């Protein structure tokens, strides 16, 4: 068997696509998606909310490319890390010493959106990238990279 490369935890909600409001999940839907105990053998922990830094060191704008869009018409999750990598200073990117990361998704990113990528170093042990919609100013995601 291969080496474990990544684990993940998430909280899920059911959203009405028309109203964009959270809805109560039906028993029928719960029954359709049962846990697989053999695949949940890592320590569970409560998800904590990442906070937006008070100040930033740099900002770039990026227009979302069609190739980054998944079948749900949202930006694929891997590209959140790609955007974070694009804003990091070159010496940090070259050092390649990120040991862990967290992503807090707040709002979907879609094709053609212009995203402002903000970079901060709030601690000596991490970097934080905040992704905001340039038009609305809404936070789309906060990414924390640990060194």
Where are these regions (language model features)?
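HotDog/MaoC-like acyl-thioester-processing domains
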Residues: 1-48, 109-111, 121-147
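Intrinsic-disorder/low-complexity, polar/charged segments enriched in Ser/Thr/Lys/Arg/Asp/Glu/Gln
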Residues: 7, 54-61, 100, 114-116, ...
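Generic anion/oxyanion-binding catalytic loop in active/binding sites
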Residues: 9, 69, 101
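Generic structural detector for well-ordered beta-strands
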Residues: 11-13, 61-65, 104, 146
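Hot-dog-fold acyl-thioester-processing enzymes
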Residues: 16-97
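Intrinsically disordered, low-complexity segments enriched in small/polar residues
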Residues: 78, 103, 116-117, 125, ...
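Active-site beta-strand->loop segment that positions catalytic residues and contacts the acyl thioester
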Residues: 100-121
């Amino acid at each position: 068997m291969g080496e474990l490369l990544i684990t993940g935890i998430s909280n899920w909600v059911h959203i009405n696509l028309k109203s964009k409001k959270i809805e109560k999940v039906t028993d029928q839907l719960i029954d359709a998606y049962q846990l697989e105990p053999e695949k949940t053998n890592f320590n569970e922990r409560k998800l904590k909310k990442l906070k937006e830094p008070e100040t930033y060191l740099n900002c770039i704008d990026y227009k979302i490319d069609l190739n980054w869009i998944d079948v749900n018409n949202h930006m694929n999750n891997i590209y959140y890390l790609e955007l974070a990598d694009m804003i990091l200073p070159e010496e940090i990117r070259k050092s390649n010493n990120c040991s862990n990361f967290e992503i807090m998704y707040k709002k979907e990113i879609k094709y053609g959106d212009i995203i402002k990528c903000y970079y901060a170093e709030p601690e000596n042990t991490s970097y934080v990238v905040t992704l905001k919609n340039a038009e609305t100013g809404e936070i789309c995601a906060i990414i924390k990279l640990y060194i």
